[in-house]
Each structure stands twice: as structure tokens, then as C-alpha cells.
Amino acid sequence: MADLSSVDEFLNQCKQSGDAAYGALRSVLERLEDPNTRSKARIFLSDIYKRVGSSETSLQTYHFHIQDIYLDQYEGFQSRKKLTMMVIPSIFIPEDWSFTFYEGLNRHPDTIFKDKTVSELGCGNGWISIAIAAKWLPSKVYGLDINPRAVKISWINLYLNALDDNGEPVYDEEKKTLLDRVEFYESDLLGYCRDNKIQLERIVGCIPQILNPNPEAMSKLITENASEEFLHSLSNYCALQGFVEDQFGLGLIARAVEEGISVIKPAGIMIFNMGGRPGQGVCRRLFERRGVRVTQMWQTKILQAADTDISALVEIERSSPHRFEFFMGLSGDQPICARTAWAYGKAGGRISHALSVYSCQIRQPNLVKIIFDFLKNGFQEISNSLDLSFEDETVADEKIPFLAYLASVLKNSSYFPFEPPAGSKRFCSLIAGFMRTYHRIPINQDNIVVFPSRAVAIESAFRLFSPRLAIVDEHLTRQLPRSWLTSLAIEDTSMDKSDDQITVIESPHQSDLMIELIKKLKPQVVVTGMAPFEVITSSSFLHLLEVTKEIGCRLFLDISDHFELSSLPASNGVLKYLAENQLPSHAAIICGLVKNKVYSDLEVAFVITEVDAIAKALSKTVEVLEGHTAIISQYYYGCLFHELLAFQLADRHAPAERESEKAKSEEIIGFSSSAVSILKDAELSVTEIDETSLIHMDVDQSFLQIPQSVKAAIFESFVRQNISEAEVDINPSIKQFVWSNYGFPTKSSTGFVYADGSLALFNKLVICCAQEGGTLCLPAGTNGNYVAAAKFLKANVVNIPTESSDGFKLTEKTLTKALESVKKPWVCISGPTVSPTGLVYSNEEMDILLSTCAKFGAKVIIDTSFSGLEYSATSWDLKNALSKMDSSLSVSLLGCLSLNLLSGAIKLGFLVLDQSLIDAFHTLPGLSKPHSTVKYAAKKMLALKEEKASDFLDAVSETIKTLEGRSRRLKEVLQNSGWEVIQPSAGISMVAKPKAYLNKKVKLKAGDGQEIVELTDSNMRDVFLSHTGVCLNSGSWTGIPGYCRFSFALEDSEFDKAIESIAQFKSVLAN
């Protein structure tokens, strides 16, 4: 320890080396930290200053330098005018860079730091932290630096200015000293504040912005005893941080901003020094893409420090098109690149660069914090794609809340939960809430049915009611099947005619012309919109209601063009009418949501009806025809509705008293007879009872954990802006996918069609089959949703018997026997994985089946939607089989990216279409196409699969291992409970026959008493559900008499509950 009684002895020790000088100064600091020796130590520092003065030569002689920094040169400044500061060679030495930064701080209002909690990043010798405390009287200033020696010198400087030359405390106007206001800590950026949960109100930073010319040096362990050269470079250069801004030397600033977002209070301000070398646009974008508003407080030019090596910037220019901005001297006004500046500097010239001080505030801070909190938990790589910069504030107000909501969903949920196919309950509730709050229409979520799009809603309604004659607004016919628009079967529209043919007449958009057509043609269904001038009042709508009711016609009124998602929606006569009158039973409202500020192609639609039977029938129809509505679309628009409702006080107004419908039309068209039959028998999702109590083993969705890489792809698809067409062109990825996984060849003439799921694509193929007079051949043991859909679409369906000895798979014998008596056969084969049995077709089996189909001239649909999770290695190679076939054989490949990519409810259906079907398929335009964000995410996930990314492949392997283990466990429980089980080899489902239960009488609870029920295929599902709370599919759904389907890709605790409930079911026999 240095002898404090002798200045000479102290100085002699300092002369020896920088390390010796630092050791002597540390001993002084120890005395300063001790209240008993503090005053004497401060006087000792004064004596040293008097001896060495402020000459810069002391830095070479004694390895330290003491200087005065003058804070304010103007009159009226009441506080201290100067600080006395010490520096040593191994820390950042105050120069133009930091003086300009302080000038920028001075340009803020005097209240900027008053009573605030402040942190300075890269405090160096602490002079700015101390100056802030001296001038603006903050509550606390935390000076942080990664250089441990800088922190020690900062503490010395704090005591040097907190006490006077006589060792007495210097008090400010609030009777506090600098020691009350300032603390210094060793910290990598804001690590100290984050670890100690310190919430900041102001963050200031004067941070290095040039990459170290020797990157390896930055990876050394930082210790107080490291070499002076290393510690000096640590204070003057930055290392690579893993951000895109690294290419400009701004990676450390980028990390500082992101760390700042996590610890700053919502109304907080961050102030940074920004060297203009990368260009002002690059500097501003660093902040703006992170959701930070930027104000330039001060800009000047400064000379580049002579000891700063800019060779790293020269290397960046060499390997990229970017050019940095330097100037020749302070007076130069034409920028030069880093290479020219480097050469000019080497030749003795002085180079300068712009220097700006930016004041930054987070837009929508609480939401942006949620986004960054999500990113830092394993999604840091997405940060480089993040773009929260918006020229239009209304766009920011829409997108940022959604990103925060999506981040919360992905962070807090390991999987996407089951949602009713006709719309998530939350989304329907939000729509109803919006209608009640903004339009005073007292409806609830049960009056809302959600569809993927307006076009799908209209087509679904037609298929449910099967009108022989309909009139449709000319603006709404574009997405209808061409056959409906070209049929001329309008002569006889009597109620007892066959309802197979739908004829649509196109009508002018104007309501008086529409009404004239309705009166003359007397259609059974009318679908129309309204002109802008007609929707202002309710008279046109009222007229339409009266005319359609009079002739017994159903009316679907489209209000999509007039429905505003706004806190001040424009007047709407239709909604005014509904606020005062109940919607008549023959009418329904269709609304397509397309008016968002961000995604013009993101659509979801809903239908409002106040007839419970119609709401239920439409709900079942959308499930049969579409399977589901994309959950992301519901999340997006649900977020918009939520934003409009969140600030409202609930139930401020009593529900409106409305006029009831006076008389109902007697002769109005009902559901088609075939639709009624199919919807009654189809085992669709159970949604009528309390959802929380149900365990869904009856859905084709995985509820297993979604991998981080998949969540990353989903989130990245939304955080990016200006995504190019090539990045959402999924055709090349699908071509590679079907080739790599199934050996399925494609040609230039092959068609590629996409939808929100595979069921919608399958249904279009069914319609193609029906239009050419074909027969759809489905094996017994086909997914029941497909069978129900085909029958609903009135296709000619032939069931091909299968045998339990073959695992209910197709064989050459069963297929040949079936095709011998069928004209124009279309054969649908589920494979490699068969749904619902979970068995797998081998290459040899597929070769035989394709040969058999070719022999009979059958068109083939291979459905791969349930494949990709085979328990043992299965490699399909259809190329060899197809190469042996006649070129006239039509084979199309259907699939869905969900199970195989572990993406849960995020689905993309694809159809690789044989050339012979392309023209026919495109006469059926009403497909709900996947949104560009879904395509982007799917393409990223397919790339992970193709590149064999280890994290993704590990997740797939773990999922397969989980499913295989569950299949064994479920089989064991079922067998022990009297079930006959077909052991699966792949996928998420299995089939089992309740051998011990079928045709047995059991007693079940019925209200307050009991009833005796005989268990059959037709009631097995209901009985099992009522006794166990588990939803399964019975033999009526599987097509295999007696065999029920169990889907076991449940969340862990749900699976355990299901196992327990299944085991308890055998107790019904005890009755």
C-alpha cells in the first residue's frame, strides 16, 4: 500500500509502470472508502494535483493525469463550473467524442434528469455521470463500465469532486453530496441493473463503435490485472455482438438499445452518441427498427482520434457494398470512404466524421418490452429480422399490439390449444363485444360463425341450402364455381325438384335493380352487398328484407365494404337497424374482414344469424368443408377488436330493447336433405358443452410441444417487413419436399395449389370428380372427415372393404375387386401413414396399388397429410413405381405441413396436381389461400428440414419417440380394459375395438336418475364422452365397424388424464 504521508513516495511508485501507478491509486481509493481516513486521503489527492499539475506529460511520467473539465461557460449557471478528473492509460480518455456527447445532453430541458434514476453505459473515468449528478440533481446515477480499472478510477473521481480540497463534503441545494447520488459498478452494458432488477428512467451511453482490428483480443477474460493494452482496447473498440449492425461497427450500440428496452421504465429516455461513419440512415434505422423514436439533439464534426485504427471498417467495405462516411479535415463537406480515409490518415492527413446525439423513446413501450422479452428467451436470431419502423402511426398502432400478443402466446404456451372449427371462442366473443359496444347490437358469441373468407362463407351457405336458383351481387360472383354461373336450369324452381343443381344469376350491385330481379325470378337464396349511398340509412336493407320474406327467400347481406374496425365507425344503416330490431329468421349478415392497415391479403369472415339452428348448421358446414379457420388470422383480427374494447368500461349501457320478428316466412328454403343427413351422422367436434372439461382425442391436430425453431419461423414471418416475392414463393420448397420425402417427381406442367389445410383441397378434388361423373373410391378405414365431406358434396362414393388381417390397408385383391365394377374411378390412398390406423404402406405395397389403379385407368390421390412421423425409418420412393406406369396415369399428391413440421395449428395444405386436372380444378376458385406469413414460415421450416438443422431434427426425433411411447402405453391400457387394438407404426392416432363393451347394456347417469343403454357404434362416442369426458371417434367415423379412433398427440397432463379416464371406463360393465 502506498505511503499517504509522502507525495514523493507515491509519485516514485507511479513512475515505475502503469500497473504500479494503478496499484498506488487503488490504495488511495481504499482510504477514500473508509470514512475514518476519507478526509485525509482527499487532502492527499489535492497535494498530488498541486505537485503534478494538469500537464499531459504526467501521463507519460507518472502514468496518470489530472485535469479540470469546465462544465458551463454561460452566466446563470448556479452549480459548480468545473470537475477535477483523473485518467490512466488503460481507460477511455475524455476527448471530443465525450465532450460532444455532454453538449448533446445539455440541449435537453433542465428537467431531463431531475429526480430520475439514471445509468451511464461506458462511463470511462466517470466524468459524465458525475457531471449529470452535479448539474441536474438526479435521484441516482449508476456509472457502468466493463473495464474494472475504469470503475476504480471513477470512484476516485467521485471522491475527488464530492469532497473539497480540505476533505470536507460539498453539498448541493438539496443538502446532498455527489456520494449520495452516484455509484459506479463493473458491468457489461446494463448487466448490473438487470441482475439487480433496477428500473431506470434515463440511460445515456457514449459507447465504442469501431470493431477491434484484433477480434481475438476481445474474447480474453476481463480482469483488473489484464494488460494495459487490452484494457485500453476494451474501452475504445467493440467486439462482434451477433447483430446485423455488426457490419457497421454498431453491434454494441444495438445490444445496448435492446438491453435498455428491458430495464427502462415505459416513459424513459435513452440518449446515445452516434458516430456518423456508417451514414445517418444506418444510425437512425438501428433505433427505429427496434420500435424506438429518434430525435437528433445535436450534430457536429470531430476529428478521428489519431490512435483509433479504422482498418476494420476498410475490411467491411472490401466485403460489402456499404461505404462509410469520413471527411478530409473539419472543413471538408464531401464524404470519403473508409479506405480513402485510411490512406489519407496514413499519409499524415487529419480525417473527421459526423457525430450526433440521439434522444430515444420507445413507442408503445409496454408492448415493445413484451416483444423483446420474448426475443431474449432463445429467439435472439430473429432480432436481426425485427422491423418496428413505421412511417404511418396507424400501422404501428395495429402491428405492434399484435406482435406483442403473438409473442405472449408463443412464450407462454408450448402448443396451440384446440379451438372450435367455426371460430375460437375468444374471437367470436370479441366480435360480439364490438357489436354490442360500438353498434348497440345485443348479440353473443353463439350468434357468430367464423369462416376463412367471405367467398368460403357464401359457397358454404349455398352447399348447406342447395338452392336451385340464387341471385348474387355481381361483385360477389368471382369466387363461385363456374358451373353455377353457366347453368340455365331456371325454368322450374318448385320445392320438390332434385336439389343437385345450383344456378346462380348475376345481379347489378344497385338494390332497386336487385329487387326487381328478385320479384321476377323468385330465387330461393339472395346474396348481395349494398352501394355506399344505400348503406347510410336502413331503408334499402328494410326493403330487401321485406321483398325476400314475401317470396320465401333467404337473404345473405354482405357488409364487408362498409364494416369499419375503428373507435369511431361511420354510420351504417344495416347495423342501426339491427340495434333496434332482431335480425329476421330468413336473413343473415356476412362480413369479410379485410380492412386492416398492414396486410391487405389477410382475411377472415364471420356470419351473424340469430337463429340457433342456422348457426349450428353453418358451424358444422365450415368444419366439414374447411376443417378450420386459420388461427393466426383470428389472432390478428382478434387483437384489433381487443384494442378497440380494452379501454371501454364494461356494460355501461343496458342491452337494447329490440323489436321481435312479427311473422316468419312459411315457405322459406331449408337445409338440403343430404346436408341434414350428413351433418347429423358426421362425428364433428364436440363444442356444445363446457370446453374446459373435454379431452380431445378426436381431432387431427398435435398438442405436443412446438420446437423453438418453429416458433421462431412463425414470429419472424410477422416481425419482418418488405418480404420479397421470392421469400414467400413456396413452390421450389414443396417440389423439393415431395421429392426428398416421397420421391414424387414434378414437371413444368405440374400444378401447385395451396390452402389453409388439406381438407379444403381434398373437397375441390371431390367436386372435380363429381363434375366428370367419376366415382370416389375410399377404403374402409379412411379418415372420417374426408368421408363426411365427400358425401356432403354429393359425390358418388364407393367404400372399398378392407380386412383386419391386412391392418385395414388396401391390397391388390380388395382394390381390384372394387374397381372391376366402378366407372371412372378416383382412388384416394392415405400414405405413407394411414389415417386413422397409424399403419404404414411400404414401397412395394404402393407399387402394387398404383399398378392396379393404372390397369383400371383410375385417377389416384395420394394423401400424405398425416405422414412424416413414422416410428421407424420409412423411405418412400414413388419415382420408381411411377416410371413403370403408363404416362396417362393421373396421380396427384395431397399434403399438409403441420404434423411433419411440428407446427400444431399453423397449417399449410398443398396439392401437387396432375396436369390433366389443372383446368377442371381452376373452375373452382373459392379456396381460402394461406397468408403470405404462413408461406414464409413454412418455407423457413422446410429449409430447416432439408438442411437437417440439428435442433429441428432433434425435436422431430423426440416427438416421434414420445408418440411411439404413448401408442404403447395407450395400447396396454386399452387391452387391459377389454379393447382389441391395432398397434400403430406412425402418426398420432390408433384404432381399437371395444370388444368387451359392444352390444352390452350399461347403466349411465341421466339427469337425476339412470338409464340403461346398449353400446353400439352409433352411441359409443356419446356414452364414452358422458362417462369419461374424452372425445373419441366411433366405428361410424372410422368406417371400420366397431373400431374407434384415439388421437394421442395431447399435452402431457391431458394425456395422463385421458389414460386414467379410459382405464376407469371399464367400470360401466360393473353395472
UniProtKB/Swiss-Prot annotation:
Lineage: Eukaryota, Viridiplantae, Streptophyta, Embryophyta, Tracheophyta
Subunit structure: Homotetramer.
Subcellular location: Cytoplasm
InterPro entries per UniProt: Aminotransferase_I/II_large, Met_S-MeTrfase, PyrdxlP-dep_Trfase, PyrdxlP-dep_Trfase_major, PyrdxlP-dep_Trfase_small, SAM-dependent_MTases_sf
SUPFAM superfamilies: PLP-dependent transferases, S-adenosyl-L-methionine-dependent methyltransferases
Family annotation (CDD domains): AdoMet_MTases (cd02440)
CC terms in the record's Gene Ontology section: cytosol; plastid
GO biological process terms, semicolon-separated: biosynthetic process; methylation; S-adenosylmethionine metabolic process; selenium compound metabolic process
GO molecular function, one term: pyridoxal phosphate binding
Annotated catalysed reactions: L-methionine + S-adenosyl-L-methionine = S-methyl-L-methionine + S-adenosyl-L-homocysteine
Keyword terms of this UniProt record: Acetylation, Cytoplasm, Methyltransferase, S-adenosyl-L-methionine, Transferase
Enzyme class: transferase
Family, similarity comment: Belongs to the class I-like SAM-binding methyltransferase superfamily.
Role: Catalyzes the S-methylmethionine (SMM) biosynthesis from adenosyl-L-homocysteine (AdoMet) and methionine. SMM biosynthesis (by MMT1) and degradation (by HMT-1, HMT-2 and HMT-3) constitute the SMM cycle in plants, which is probably required to achieve short term control of AdoMet level. Also able to catalyze the selenium-methylmethionine (SeMM) from AdoMet and selenium-methionine (SeMet). May play a role in phoem sulfur transport; such function is however not essential.
EC number: 2.1.1.12
The protein, known as: Methionine S-methyltransferase
Tissue-wise expression: Expressed in roots, rosette leaves and cauline leaves. Expressed at a lower level in developing seeds.
